[in-house]
From Swiss-Prot:
Binds 1 [4Fe-4S] cluster per heterodimer. The cluster is bound at the heterodimer interface by residues from both subunits. InterPro entries: LIPOR_BchN/ChlN, Nase/OxRdtase_comp1, Protochl_reductN. One of its GO terms (molecular function) is 4 iron, 4 sulfur cluster binding. [4Fe-4S] cluster binds at residues 22, 47, 107. Keywords: 4Fe-4S, ATP-binding, Chlorophyll biosynthesis, Chloroplast, Iron, Iron-sulfur, Metal-binding, Nucleotide-binding, Oxidoreductase, Photosynthesis, Plastid. Gene3D superfamilies: Nitrogenase molybdenum iron protein domain (3.40.50.1980). GO terms for biological process: light-independent chlorophyll biosynthetic process; photosynthesis, dark reaction. Component of the dark-operative protochlorophyllide reductase (DPOR) that uses Mg-ATP and reduced ferredoxin to reduce ring D of protochlorophyllide (Pchlide) to form chlorophyllide a (Chlide). This reaction is light-independent. The NB-protein (ChlN-ChlB) is the catalytic component of the complex. Pfam families: Oxidored_nitro. Belongs to the BchN/ChlN family. This is Light-independent protochlorophyllide reductase subunit N. The lineage of its organism: Eukaryota, Viridiplantae, Streptophyta, Embryophyta, Tracheophyta. Its EC number is 1.3.7.7.
Length: 467
């Protein structure tokens, strides 16, 4: 991976605390993506309350995840953890019959040093169901890194690209008890090495990105994760991999070091500009010249004209929450917005090198100043800077949204960008809808004169409701 960072982009680091969801929230979208999986979160009542409230799914709906609640006997080592987990997994196999069970470790399992990795192989052999262990706990920087941890663990179970002659396939059969689906070649593809895309996206977005690459005669050999555990892609020497999300640096490192794959360092397909750059970075690797991307991007920008007129000249401040701030900021700058600061809990500068380069090029193209990038920002310092800058919009975690709104700054929850469909050419309108909603609300309240806190000319004033 390239380690060169553009010199004109300055990266600062403060000593702030992490203000983010717990990474076990990754269960909320991964259990829907991997359709034959079952997630077992090993934690305390607090973890259960969080999942119950964050996911909004009642237990009566029988979702494909559950809590293995630790009791006082587990903490004091009076109970046999192996037997307790075995009982739960046998019940899960009987009731839900999953192809894979994924144990999610929490802060408590880290503190009491529960040997989940040691118990999983033995229990896997006993019950005949693959068991993966992912420690997606609150020690991470951001909640999106829960997915990164799960995918990194899952990459170890992907079959090898080529099995040596005469080697037994017993291991592969054990890990993948279901036959792999045969692919149908409906399009004549270019002759190129295998390409695997990693990152969890809804099925419709997977189809969209597959279609975009198919138009360039590039065949996607598989996705990590796949919809079914048995359909995990083959990995190994000579396989090229490319990510779709900025928070998957741990997975990228695993694919490079452990599976010997070649990483394509590309910007991320968020927004029309990012999607075009993502495809343009993949094509030359396989000796293919990208076609018709510029015209495609221009058509998308033309269709967004009504939104662009609304956001052009507006300012935005990223407090930092989910590790996709760089990509969203780059897209908003391309839309004509002014980005004062990009706060981000953590950034792998090698994995996001191409995204940083695209950010700089976008600022130059739009004649915008390069925003300040602050890693691990201190919220107190950020609030002081916001008081001076008075941005039109702050993209922040939920904890700071209401206090900032009371001070006349429009806010948008950063978590909404995580769960919204923001990838590909076709979903740029959804991103702008999220951004413009608080801007339109503030303008409407201003026109109605029915709010007690409205900002005009960067000053707060109190208005009396119309009787």
């Amino acid at each position: 991976m390239s380690t060169k960072i553009v010199e004109t982009i300055t990266l600062e680091c403060e000593t702030g605390n992490y203000h983010s969801f717990c990474p076990i929230s990754c269960v909320s979208w991964l259990y829907q993506k991997i359709e034959d999986s079952f997630f077992l979160v090993v934690g305390t009542k607090t973890c259960g309350y969080f999942l119950q409230n964050a996911l909004g799914v009642m237990i009566f709906a029988e979702p494909r995840y559950a809590m293995a609640e630790l009791e006082e006997g587990d903490i004091s080592a009076h109970l046999n953890d192996y037997e307790e987990l075995k009982t739960l997994c046998i019940r899960i196999r009987k009731d839900r019959d999953p192809s894979v069970i994924i144990w999610i470790g929490t802060c408590t399992t880290e503190i009491i040093k529960m040997d989940l990795e040691g118990m999983a192989p033995k229990l896997e052999y006993e019950i005949g169901v693959p068991i993966l262990v992912a420690r997606a706990n609150g020690l991470d920087y951001a909640f999106t890194q829960g997915e990164d941890t799960v995918l990194a663990v899952m990459a170890h179970r992907c079959p090898d690209q080529e099995l040596p002659i005469g080697e037994s396939k017993e291991t592969k059969t054990k890990l993948f008890p279901f036959p792999l689906l045969k692919e149908k070649n409906l399009v004549e593809y270019a002759n190129h090495p295998p390409l695997v895309i990693f990152g969890s996206l809804p099925s419709n977005l997977v189809s969209q990105l597959d279609t975009e690459l198919r138009r360039q005669f590039i065949k996607v050999s598989g996705w990590l994760p796949a919809q079914r555990y048995a359909d995990l892609p083959s990995l190994g020497d000579g396989v090229y991999v490319c990510g779709v999300n900025p928070f998957l640096s741990r997975t990228a490192t695993t694919l490079i070091r452990r599976k010997k794959c070649e990483l394509i360092v590309a910007p991320f397909p968020i927004g029309p500009d990012g999607t075009r750059a993502w495809i343009e970075r993949i094509c030359p690797v396989f000796g293919i010249e990208a076609q018709s991307l510029e015209e495609r991007e221009e058509r998308i920008w033309e269709s967004l004209k009504d939104y662009l007129d609304l956001v052009r000249g507006k300012s935005v401040f990223f407090m930092g929450d989910n590790l996709i701030e760089i990509s969203i900021a780059r897209f908003l700058i391309r839309c004509g917005m002014i980005v004062y600061e990009i706060g981000i809990p953590y950034m792998d500068k090698r994995y996001q090198a191409a995204e940083l380069a695209l950010l700089q090029n976008t600022c130059i193209r739009m004649c915008m100043p390069i925003p300040r990038i602050v890693e691990k920002p201190d919220n107190s310092n950020q609030i002081r800077r916001m008081r001076e800058l008075q941005p039109d919009l702050a993209i922040t975690g939920m904890a700071h949204a209401n206090p900032l709104g009371a001070r006349g700054i429009g806010t948008k929850w950063s978590v909404e960008f995580t769960f919204a469909q923001i990838h590909g050419f076709a979903n740029a309108r959804d991103v702008l809808e999220l951004v413009t909603r608080p801007l339109r609300r503030n303008e409407n309240l201003d026109n109605l004169d029915r709010t007690t806190l409205v900002r005009k000319n960067n000053e707060l004033y109190t208005s009396t409701p119309v009787k």
